[in-house]
């Protein structure tokens, strides 16, 4: 419950006041101290470089595991499409399918158009499962190299299909 309260405030008037000045004869003394500048040696430079190189390599390795591509389900203009609808990824890279339009969508891989030996049930959503709200996601990581075709079951007839190539 919101409420509004009002109050009256009296503000005093300071008209007719005069500013006064005080003369001071204080002396301020500042002393400075000499600071030795740090010396850079080749040994410490190489050590710092080595630490930085190891940290950079670790960051790249961790970032490589966290790599993901985002595929939008539906265009900003209301179109029924995967955006992008044809792309390539590295083996094991995560694909995040994100409903950005709020229409019911899903991601189903075509069992006839995936590499042999891949279990379509392990990588697809069930055709009856839907991502209904904007921002809902479905994630999958494809580990077998090859070409995978996928579609949105409710909108496949409208051309909402895509293809991913795993390198």
UniProtKB/Swiss-Prot annotation:
Q: Write out the annotated subcellular location.
A: Plastid, Chloroplast thylakoid membrane
Which coenzyme or cofactor does it need?
Cu(2+)
Decide whether keyword Membrane is in the record: yes
Indicate yes or no for the key word Methyltransferase: no
Q: Which residues bind Cu cation?
A: 105, 152, 155, 160
Described function: Participates in electron transfer between P700 and the cytochrome b6-f complex in photosystem I. Seems to be the major plastocyanin in Arabidopsis.
Which family does the similarity line name? Belongs to the plastocyanin family.
Q: What is this protein called?
A: Plastocyanin major isoform, chloroplastic
């Amino acid at each position: 419950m919101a409420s509004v309260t009002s109050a009256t405030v009296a503000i005093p008037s300071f008209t007719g006041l005069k500013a006064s000045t005080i003369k001071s004869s204080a002396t301020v003394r500042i002393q400075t101290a000499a600071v030795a500048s740090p010396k850079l040696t080749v040994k410490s430079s190489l050590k710092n470089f080595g630490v930085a190189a190891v940290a950079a390599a670790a960051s790249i390795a961790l970032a490589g595991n966290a790599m993901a591509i985002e595929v939008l389900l539906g265009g900003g203009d209301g179109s029924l499409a995967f955006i992008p609808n044809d792309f390539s990824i590295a083996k094991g890279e995560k694909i995040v399918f994100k409903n950005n339009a709020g229409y019911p969508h899903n991601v189903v891989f075509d069992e006839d158009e995936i590499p042999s030996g891949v279990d379509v049930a392990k990588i697809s959503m069930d055709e009856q499962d839907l991502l209904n709200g904007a921002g809902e996601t479905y994630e999958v990581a494809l580990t077998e190299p090859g070409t995978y075709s996928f579609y949105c079951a409710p909108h496949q007839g409208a051309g909402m299909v895509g293809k991913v190539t795993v390198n």
